[in-house]
């Protein structure tokens, strides 16, 4: 595995990320959520993609793609492992969203190219990274109450907002993926909350990918 070449690709791709608002439709009609996981000891990559109407946040479509994993897990290079399955799920959608929430990092990455940014560049769609853990940067400790907020900083640059979406839950790291500013990324995530830790697009993507009870009951109630 030529990590030097992958690192150079990351730096080059990151320079093409648009960090300001360039939504084709604002507000969007459809918002997607995307989540990637692995099966069979990592040999299979599974990507779930859901489509929600906005502003109702009603689930209207979901697709799951499974492909052979193309590279091993290497910290800092996860997007190269995840994007092929995301592209496969993207191609399965009957209609394309105006905005995509990706479970993972956007520019809040050591070389400013997390999976939300990488995928956004590949399909040229506005994306937001919604991550559950910090990958780089520093932030001031958050108060315990919901709504607590702090910038994630690295080398004098704001990479994300650290936001406690729910009491007694760890905060989310919300970042520009592509064609969405960091402040708008936070605002869109906040508009898509329904009382859970995760915003509805990535909550549903996770539920579909992992066949959680919410998704099982949803499918049982479909005609």
Swiss-Prot record:
It catalyses: Endonucleolytic cleavage at apurinic or apyrimidinic sites to products with a 5'-phosphate. Its main location: cytoplasm. Coiled coil: none annotated. Its cofactor is Mg(2+). Keywords: Cytoplasm, DNA damage, DNA repair, Endonuclease, Hydrolase, Magnesium, Metal-binding, Nuclease. Mg(2+) binds at residues 35, 103. Signal peptide: none annotated. CDD domains: Endonuclease_V (cd06559). It is found in: Cytoplasm. Belongs to the endonuclease V family. DNA repair enzyme involved in the repair of deaminated bases. Selectively cleaves double-stranded DNA at the second phosphodiester bond 3' to a deoxyinosine leaving behind the intact lesion on the nicked DNA. This is Endonuclease V.
